[in-house]
């Protein structure tokens, strides 16, 4: 099953997440199909905290991909801000 989920990157105590489309059997930070955005939980006011390619996310959902709870919350937040 294909899922849209977060992959953790960044340094210790300074997380940075890539929003990726991946097979659910692969490791969290392992092989992925496509990168569709990022999420920086510790971004300052001047920095961009979240960027999502909503067109590609809609494409993958149309193909049958499931969305993780956290990514669904991020999509809702981005849609509310726009």
From Swiss-Prot:
Q: Does the keyword Hydrolase apply?
A: yes
Q: Specify the domain of life of the species encoding this protein.
A: Bacteria
- Subunit composition? Part of the 30S ribosomal subunit.
Alphabetical keyword list = Endonuclease, Hydrolase, Nuclease, Ribonucleoprotein, Ribosomal protein
A single MF term (Gene Ontology):
four-way junction DNA binding
Q: What is this protein called?
A: Small ribosomal subunit protein bS16
Induction cue: Part of the rpsP-rimM-trmD-rplS operon.
Q: Which SUPFAM superfamilies match?
A: Ribosomal protein S16
Main function: In addition to being a ribosomal protein, S16 also has a cation-dependent endonuclease activity.
Q: Give the UniProt family note.
A: Belongs to the bacterial ribosomal protein bS16 family.
Its encoding gene is what? rpsP
Q: Which organism is it from?
A: Escherichia coli (strain K12)
Gene Ontology biological process terms from the UniProt entry: cytoplasmic translation; ribosomal small subunit assembly
Q: Which Pfam family, any one, appears in the UniProt record?
A: Ribosomal_S16
Q: Which GO terms describe its cellular component?
A: cytoplasm; cytosolic small ribosomal subunit; small ribosomal subunit
